């Protein structure tokens, strides 16, 4: 009888066993393997498995499944259960999975997870992959019991390469057991330790901005500028906002904000993350704002360079006109984010008594040194009891120099008569060093100088920028020497651009202005030239004879004369009467305005009404002067 009962019971068990799903066998094998790998302490703290537990699978991690107690109260569909936490206070899952990351309602954002056909339909393919870590009170199962084979589960796990952040930190909650790390970590550690893995070199002490792309897009050091998993990520709206920055468990090593390789464009750039410009704007990805600000800093300077038109000249370009015209760029306050020629920054507006390149080094072009300043520097406001030797001692640290002032040889005095002097440096680089040592106030440069009775008296330093010697206002007009005037007595601080603006305001039609400089030191000589584009403006200027120059502190009455050339032929005989020689005389009267040789001058000006005209001749320094004509 007992044998019959045992046989009937075994047959009944055999009939029930095929009805069990294959997932139960897989689950039983998984439990046995996990129990073997777990330490005794973990097995003791694990609660017994209840037969009514409900199997659940992560909507985003098909290879990651777990069990959950069946809900006792009405709730949302299981598709939402993986996104929001159940309200439990279990911190073991968070601490053991991603230490140091502050979860938002129990969830975290993952932008590097691939889309999968098992993704929950709530999210869909157009949403950024997210993983909601629900707080569980039961042991988590790392493999899906419904997986067709074991190889697929391990393949899917290997795709999620985030193991540097995953740790095997034991659970601190008595209500949860440590997720058996044996199968998971053993599969991942081998992949993370390979040299070909680009993420394996991440160190715990690095800047969190350079961390793996968790919530902040693609991380730094990715071999491709695009996301290798989801290159064309679409705009999405989500109820989960992950913090773009997070604190790490390990201490951060102090690092400079701007590094030497900050502006590298290769994969070695560790400061500026690669940014996908083809991706639509992501309102929840705050990291794009940080990248945009950094891109603004390292953007090229083409918009500023575009301000240089025909009216400007750069030392590396061809001359705009026959004259060696140069830009009139500002000379002070050169910025480190824009390291190019200061001529690009000139705009002819506002106070430009100082230019923007004073502290910049000497430029070199094609191996040749390009000078920016005159070697002659004006120094004003000197102490009255300072002599030549003391002035030399005060400025010798910038380089060899000679101290000079007007009529020094005739006066035989060791003291500057009017409190100013000129410093003649041997090298132009000494002038730049002097400028760098000065203090700027109200657009002027000052340096403290001491005398026997006065200690640290500020004196004004006024260098001359070579780019201020010429200014082209209208580059489309050709320069006509016969429409050019000479301006005598120009104050030395006045620049070419300021002279052009004054003359254009008075007479109009100015196309060029220049300041005469000596050929050796290239310092202003106190005269200038202005070329007009039409005859009316030219005649109006020479007819006035005197002009009041007013600009800032400058207010001086200067003389205006026609600009006389010494290589012009006679306008009457074209050299036939004078043997082909150049005409020595120019008549500045508005009825003539011509060059004459001696024979033609006598012939033309013997007529009634012209006998009182005085010829102009060119003398040294481009200065025309009236000479009496000796009638024969």
Swiss-Prot record:
Residues 375-466, 483-565 form the RRM domain. Residues 13-48, 170-193 have a biased composition (Low complexity). The keyword rRNA-binding does not apply. Keywords: Activator, Cell projection, Cytoplasm, Developmental protein, Differentiation, Nucleus, Repeat, Repressor, RNA-binding, Synapse. GO terms for molecular function: mRNA 3'-UTR AU-rich region binding; mRNA 3'-UTR binding; mRNA regulatory element binding translation repressor activity; RNA binding; RNA stem-loop binding; translation factor activity, RNA binding. The keyword Nucleotidyltransferase does not apply. In embryos, expressed in the central nervous system, and intermediate and distal pronephric tubule segments of the embryonic kidney. One of its GO terms (biological process) is regulation of synaptic plasticity. It comes from the Eukaryota. Sequence-specific RNA-binding protein which acts as a translational repressor in the basal unstimulated state but, following neuronal stimulation, acts as a translational activator. Does not bind to the cytoplasmic polyadenylation element (CPE), a uridine-rich sequence element within the mRNA 3'-UTR, but binds to a U-rich loop within a stem-loop structure. Required for the consolidation and maintenance of hippocampal-based long term memory. Inhibits differentiation of intermediate mesoderm from an early stage to inhibit pronephric differentiation but induce neural differentiation. Following synaptic activity, forms amyloid-like oligomers. Aggregation requires an intact actin cytoskeleton. This is Cytoplasmic polyadenylation element-binding protein 3.
